[in-house]
A protein has these predicted regions:
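An internal, acidic/charged active-site-proximal segment
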Residues: 179-235
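Dynamic "connector" segments at or just before major functional cores
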Residues: 1-200
Length: 235
């Protein structure tokens, strides 16, 4: 009934995440490590600290392995094969990621992610984008930074965030993302968000902008602001 299975011990280190080598090769082919070194990542205060690009790559590896909390990033540290795949002697612990991410400010985020967005779209051989804008509600439990009470159909009265998202549907790629308090509406400061998004696209032609009626709750003045931008159609 049962088949015989060959069981033996080996001295070789193994990992269930060997497929990630393809992702790392892709990033290497794109020159992503050089881009990280040029995008203005915060510097470490100690010469014993992990290099910024190593922490970013470790964060990528952790997310690709299924990490959804900082504590899960220790998986990358203790998987020696995974560390060797990216050329590390040893990976960082999860507290190293927490300490490093605390160095980011709003200005730093704008500088770093603006550079990364421009690099991505510069290397994308595609033009005449369809740009979609949308907002959503993210329910927050406990006392989270920036969370506030506002429109929340799933959990009325609970704190939430109300992020604003721009994405290019043609290539299924996020073009911009702002995390906002829950007491904001869809149209709150969205013209600045549009300007920031077009700057991320770095000269690419936008043939169509799509957004729902919530973005025009401020009246015709907001619509006229949209029309001043070089966009061919707006729905």
């Amino acid at each position: 009934m049962f088949k015989d299975v060959d069981i033996k011990f080996v001295n070789k280190e193994i990992t269930p995440f060997g497929g990630l080598s393809l992702f790392f090769k892709m990033l290497e082919k794109c020159g992503y490590d050089k881009v990280l070194q040029e995008c203005g990542l915060p510097e470490q205060g100690s010469n014993r600290g992990y290099k910024p690009w190593q922490l970013v790559m470790g964060l990528f590896a952790g997310v690709w392995c299924g990490a959804c909390k900082f504590g899960h990033l220790d998986l990358v540290r203790y998987d020696r094969v995974l560390s060797k795949m990216v050329g590390w002697d040893v990976g960082a612990g999860h507290r190293a990621y927490q300490r490093y991410l605390n160095k980011f400010t709003q200005a730093t985020n704008q500088k770093v992610f603006g550079h990364l967005y421009k690099w991505f779209f510069d290397n994308l051989v595609f033009d005449n984008y369809t740009l979609d804008f949308d907002s959503t509600v993210m329910v927050r439990e406990g006392d989270q930074e920036g969370a506030a009470k506002g429109y929340n159909p799933r959990r009325p009265g609970r704190n939430s965030h109300h992020p604003l998202i721009a994405f290019v549907s043609d290539i299924r790629m996020i073009a911009n993302y702002w995390l906002r308090p829950g007491n904001t509406s869809a149209s709150t400061n969205y013209l600045s968000f549009l300007d920031d998004t077009l700057e991320n696209l770095n000269g690419k032609k936008v043939g169509l902008v799509r957004m729902d009626s919530g973005f025009f709750s401020g009246g015709d003045t907001r619509l006229s602001g949209i029309q001043e931008v070089e966009i061919y159609h707006c729905l």
